[in-house]
Amino acid sequence: MVQRTRWRYSAIAHNYNSCRPMELGAGIAVGAWDGVWARARSAEFVAATDMGDPVYSAFMRYDDSAPLHAAVAADWATYVAADFNGGPFKYSIFPILYSFTASLVVTMGLTVIVFFNVRTKPHRGVPKLLRVAAVLACGNLLTFVVRAMMQLGRDHAEGVVPMNHILDMLWTDTAFNTVDILAVLILQLCQVQTVMRFFTRFQEKRLISLCGILLAVLSQVLWAIPPYSEAVSNHFMPLDDDKDMDVLPPFVYLVRIAQAGSYASFVLMHVFAKKKLCVQSVQMFLLTVLTVVVVVLQPAFFITDVTNVWIDNLSEIFSTTCYMGSTVIVWEWSNRLSILEARRQAQSILGRPVYEDEEQGYNFARYALKIQTALTSKSDEGDTTSATTFAAPRSARFEGKGGPQSPVYVQEGEQQAVMAFNKRMGTRALAHHVLDSIIYYTDKVVVKGLGNLSASLPSKTSSATSVRGRVRKRIGLEGANDVFVYRTKDLVFDSDEDIPRT
């Protein structure tokens, strides 16, 4: 059997006499065609082997068939009864075929879910990455299964059913390893985006994005070094006398276990935090249970991979399937959970929480002024006289995709909202801006208690400052620096007994 990773176990040498040339002595050699035979004084027989191990014979045997050679029968009995590196004989070619086909069916099912069930809005990037990773993983696994079946067909035509040849195809195929590493990298990046959705503050999302992307790229680069080194040198490096590469595979495997455990911890933490929404319906409850199973299965598989050598033989296929399942199912669960959470926030009084770092870029100010401008321009088209409407506010409805929304009150007489943002100013304009700011804050702090505000110096930025002041007033930021002094006062109310009765 092919030994790939010496750090997992020590290779045990098995010497089978039937796998070496055997001297048969004198006899008659019968050909494959009728009537073709020859008498031989001595003959040497070389049996077909599976990289040094006996192979399972695909020839039909009957009661009157010639018995096997004594050495062949003894070695085959030893091979079937032994429990060595590859496990007992039950871990032979047929369970491996079942594993290949089962992984292929699961991967194809997840690919169908990605293309037909995963929403592309409001997160457009992750669904596209999921589709690319699903196509790569499914196509790569399908190509390998077809090649394995064709190789088994050729071996069966020769009367043997080997196992190590198929595993050797899995380990030494550079194209398969390249596509697999790329697919797993994309799936890990999608997992980073999934974890980012669990947090609301931008600073937390940036930190998770930075650390997650660096870990994903680093782990995949380190994971790709051993197989590509083996492909370049045309041999399995960890089995040579050079033991420098023995330290890298276990380290990378520990990194993968840590990544899978961290991802599962984040998902389980979010399940616990949103437990009321997770059990809101039967469908959501079942999807939550499936999510917990797939995220726990991934680190459990890596740990089992270390302890069970037979699973190590198929780790490249199993790990890709586990990565795909833990990414696609968790993303779909997160989509449905976000819909339920948005619906609950829309029905509540406070709505969704808004943090200070979300104000970068004036997102909420842009949205508020956009709505106000649309309402003001729409109402001005139907008004013929404005002099009689300056005193009272009016209400207008905003028509959206979901029908008429609640009325928004706009004060008549105000000028149309114009958004003014900080732009790069020249040296002269910057000097005027600094001087105006000094005078403004001096008026606020010193002169406000003595009289009217002093007039600002004329400058080219006075109009921009006034426009910016109107914008701050409309969005409720004009009183941010005001200081108010209060004092308490006792109020005495008449009791019911003091009220005269008639």
From Swiss-Prot:
InterPro entries: PalH. Disulfide bonds: none annotated. Keywords: Cell membrane, Membrane, Transmembrane, Transmembrane helix. It comes from the Eukaryota. Coiled coil: none annotated. The chain crosses the membrane at residues 96-116, 132-152, 166-186, 207-227, 251-271, 284-304, 314-331. Residues 117-131, 187-206, 272-283, 332-502 are cytoplasmic. GO terms for biological process: ascospore formation; cellular response to alkaline pH; cellular response to pH; fungal-type cell wall biogenesis; invasive growth in response to glucose limitation; regulation of vacuole organization. It is found in: Cell membrane. One of its GO terms (cellular component) is plasma membrane. It is a multi-pass membrane protein. Residues 379-404 are annotated as: Disordered. Residues 1-95, 153-165, 228-250, 305-313 are extracellular. Its main location: membrane. It holds the Pfam family PalH. Belongs to the palH/RIM21 family. Required for the proteolytic cleavage of the transcription factor RIM101 in response to alkaline ambient pH. This is pH-response regulator protein palH/RIM21. It comes from Eremothecium gossypii (strain ATCC 10895 / CBS 109.51 / FGSC 9923 / NRRL Y-1056) (Yeast). The lineage of its organism: Eukaryota, Fungi, Dikarya, Ascomycota, Saccharomycotina.
